[in-house]
Amino acid sequence: MRLTRLKTENFRNLAAVDVTPAPGVNVIYGENAQGKTNLIEAIYLLTGQKSFRAAKESDYLRFGQEVARIEAEFTCQNREKTAALAYGSKKLAWLNGVECAPSELTGEFLAVVFSPGELALIQEGPSERRAFLDGAISQVMPRYMTTLAAISRILLQRNTLITDMQKSGNAAMMEPLLETWDRSLAKVAFSICHARARFIRRLAPPAAEIYMDICKRADQPFFLSYQPSIPAPQGADWADVSPAEGEAHIRAALAAARSEDYKNYCTTLGPHRDNMEVTIAGISARNFGSQGQQRSCALALKLAQCRVMEETLGEAPIILLDDVLSELDKTRRDYFLHGEHPGQVFITCCDRGAARTLGEGAAFRMKEGQLYLPAKRAKKRKEP
């Protein structure tokens, strides 16, 4: 996977960027608040995923502008492709020049981002880990996004119905309609549980290996487990359950939880309550891990995701390292800076020193939303 050209127009503070990155490592350096993270964000949005930053799409527009655009030329599986996004009164997307739903970019443009906020993956609640898991699955199985959209709609309808039933005082008359929603929910819930269990089964071994490689502590094994709010039938793993058995089991669980649903005016069981537990030496990394251990766990998960993507798709994703280089040990810094990762890498940092230790690749300076190319690569503008 290689980004061969990137253009932005009126995206956040970025001026008209038009850059041809190096095929290996690309270092973007500059002082804080110059636009480095904005550039990384622009690249990541081309995956069709939500931004890794807490932001509204209206924030993407440069002050005083009505439309922001991101355009890319890239190669994937030896095929040249293009992708584009536009943000204005509505969000638009194009793939190979043809307008499409933004979600259709998922699985076409492959990238994994590391940012200072990645600690939330370990430190925060289950929703952070579900989001990571669902985003990772979507990049290797794009149709999974349709399933996620479906369960969101079904849960909204089911929760609305439960509220109406409680307020009407005539819940019994409405139970047949609730059972209809239960059948719909069971179908998509099984698909999600099955996909999550299968992905975690593939993710866990490389994550444990990478964590061990980072920490060098054989007495602190890393373990990853799926903790669904509805356990699989008969103690099985959801990855091994058939659709018929799984859907019937989920319908029964929903029926058993109905009184609890009525009490809480919402659906209390389902994939929206799942967790992915990370433990070190059998102890919760979230509750008892040091910040260093938590950072290593997050890095191990992300690098394992890259490995699973490469094994599944035959293509190494682009790695985006946003202001995290200083948090990595020398071995990991060298891994990225010296081109040991099989794919393309973009690294942002404040210190120009990273550019000096760069192996084969390119260094760029970001200043006030302008990207300055090295003299030997510049066409119109040299670094001041």
Question: Across the structure, where does each feature detected by a protein language model lie?
Answer:
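Nucleotide-state sensing region of NTPase/ATPase domains
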Residues: 47-128, 132-144, 205-209, 253-259
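Structural recognition of the conserved hydrophobic beta-strand(s) that form the central parallel beta-sheet
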Residues: 72, 344-351
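Helix-to-loop junction immediately C-terminal to a conserved catalytic motif
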Residues: 44
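A conserved P-loop NTPase coupling/switch region
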Residues: 104-108, 115-187, 374-377
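Walker B catalytic acidic pair
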Residues: 322-324
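Conserved lysine of the Walker
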Residues: 35-36
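Conserved NTPase motor "head" modules and their coupling/switch loops across ABC/AAA+ ATPases, GTPases
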Residues: 1-31, 172-318, 327-331, 335-338, ...
